[in-house]
Amino acid sequence: MAEVKKIATRESYGNALVELGQENPNVVVLDADLAAATKTGMFKKAFPERHIDCGIAECNMIGIAAGLAAAGMTPFASSFAMFAAGRAFEQVRNSVGYPHLNVKIGATHGGISVGEDGATHQCCEAVSYTHL
């Protein structure tokens, strides 16, 4: 039996983005100044021309992702769960959900065990925000 290597979910996410980028030139990855934390930096290293750091601006990131999807790209927008679901909720609903755009949202660091970042980064309500 093959030995299972235990790695963080976010590391698997980064690896998967790189694999998808190799298979599909329309994949583009956006993050909100969190490339190291969400592991989108792995994609950035492999495909710098298809990575967009939107800064600490999740709402804007979702709007950019919606525009890219409308233009035929396959965007993966990545942030912490609190900000991807909470801060950007209206943009996700109006700019992605209503027009049924193909935007993938990668939300890491959900729940209450996000280490030293504290209560502002903890998100238990992400499931209720996104249960549409």
Each model region followed by its residue ranges:
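Phosphate/diphosphate-binding glycine-rich loops and adjacent basic-rich segments that engage nucleotide
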Residues: 117-128
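Thiamine diphosphate
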Residues: 35-104
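Hydrophobic alpha-helical scaffolding
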Residues: 3-7, 82, 119
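A short acidic, helix-capping loop that chelates divalent metal ions and anchors anionic groups
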Residues: 112-115
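Short, well-ordered alpha-helical scaffold segments within catalytic/effector domains
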Residues: 10-14, 59-62, 89, 123
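Conserved acidic/glycine
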Residues: 1-42, 46
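Conserved small/polar residues in nucleotide/adenosyl-binding loops
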Residues: 130-132
